[in-house]
Amino acid sequence: MPSQQDEKRQAAREVIDILHEISTLLNTHLDRTELSLCVSLIENGVNPEALATVIKELRKESSQSRGLVGGE
């Protein structure tokens, strides 16, 4: 018989799997680990809109820095 902890872990995996499917449909380019981290941050009180803004800014900066490296 699975323990309550195992059941919680399985339920969490299923939630992340569903979120990953939605994420893929929306072309967010977030993997399961990144989604899991985002969920944890939101559960701990981080504003989801602020988190989305930070992710977009980090991606923008990353693509700009890759452009600089590739252009040299």
From Swiss-Prot:
InterPro entries noted in UniProt: MZT1
Compartments (UniProt record): Cytoplasm, Cytoskeleton, Microtubule organizing center, Spindle pole body
Chief place of localization: cytoplasm
An example Gene Ontology biological process: gamma-tubulin complex localization
Covalent S-S links between cysteines: none
Alphabetic keyword roster: Cytoplasm, Cytoskeleton
Record has Transmembrane helix as a keyword: no
Ranges that cross the membrane: none
Short name of one Pfam family: MOZART1
This protein's GO CC annotations: cytoplasm; gamma-tubulin ring complex; interphase microtubule organizing center; mitotic spindle pole body; spindle
Family the UniProt entry places it in: Belongs to the MOZART1 family.
Known partners and oligomeric status: Part of the gamma-tubulin complex.
Protein task: Required for gamma-tubulin complex recruitment to the microtubule organizing center (MTOC).
PANTHER family associated with the record: MITOTIC-SPINDLE ORGANIZING PROTEIN 1
Annotated protein name in UniProt: Mitotic-spindle organizing protein 1
Organism: Coccidioides immitis (strain RS)
